[in-house]
A protein has these predicted regions:
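Positively charged n-region of N-terminal signal peptides that target proteins for export
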Residues: 1-4
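Bacterial N-terminal signal peptides
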Residues: 7-15
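Alpha-helical context
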Residues: 9, 19-23, 164-166
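Short, flexible coil/linker elements and helix-boundary hinge sites characteristic
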Residues: 14-17, 107
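N-terminal export/targeting and maturation segments
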Residues: 18-103
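Extracytoplasmic electrostatic interaction patches
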Residues: 93, 104-195
Length: 195
């Protein structure tokens, strides 16, 4: 009798533990954004004012960056501060250190920057994607991100919903889905699900 109860218990535990973890609810993400709003806005400010081009930060491949190890015992007395601090995508070392701290505070490991500049209009368009939750593999899984994109509503084929939790919507549809939910002027939650 005890063996059958233990076997049943183990079977239930293994089935329950096989389900993918639930992404954070929209409400949890909105509260998180509100708590760390100043940090999110500072990330945008740094990227808008100091960065160049479209890129991932921190860089995903070591070839994209030259980092001088401050603990290295080499003679750099002949180098100027500019030579010791080579910009990475236009970001100087103080900006990078601040970004590292801000990304840690908001719980996002990286930021994807899409920067577009128009010479004729002297204007810059910057959008950000900051992955917050991810489960699965490259071509099949679920992710939720914080997005800053002031022009998102004007794009075609973008699904923005203001009602219901994105998790529940994609579970009902259960097919490849990309949905956005507004958080605050230009800021969104993005849910990406693919099977």
């Amino acid at each position: 009798m005890k063996k059958s109860i233990i076997t049943l218990f183990l079977a239930v535990v293994s089935v329950v533990s096989c389900e993918p973890p639930m992404p954070p609810s929209d409400e949890e993400m909105i509260r998180h954004f509100a708590t760390h709003e100043a940090a999110f806005r500072k990330v945008y400010e740094i990227m808008e004012e100091s960065s160049e081009g479209s890129f991932h930060y921190p860089p995903l491949s070591p070839e994209e960056v030259i980092i001088l190890d401050p603990t290295e015992q080499s003679d750099t007395s002949h180098e100027t501060n500019d030579e010791q601090d080579l910009p990475v995508y236009g970001l100087l070392k103080p900006d990078r250190l601040q970004l590292d701290s801000l990304l840690s505070e908001i719980g996002c490991g990286l930021v994807l920057v899409d920067r577009r500049e128009w010479e004729t209009a002297d204007s810059v368009y910057v959008s950000l994607v900051m992955p917050y939750y991810s489960h699965g593999i490259v071509d099949a899984g679920t992710s939720k991100s914080f997005v800053y994109d002031p022009g998102l509503r004007s794009r075609r084929n973008i699904r923005i919903t203001e009602h219901g939790d994105l998790n529940e919507i994609y579970r009902r549809m259960y097919n490849d889905t990309t949905l956005y939910k507004p958080v605050k002027e230009g800021w969104y939650i993005k849910l990406d699900h693919s099977r």
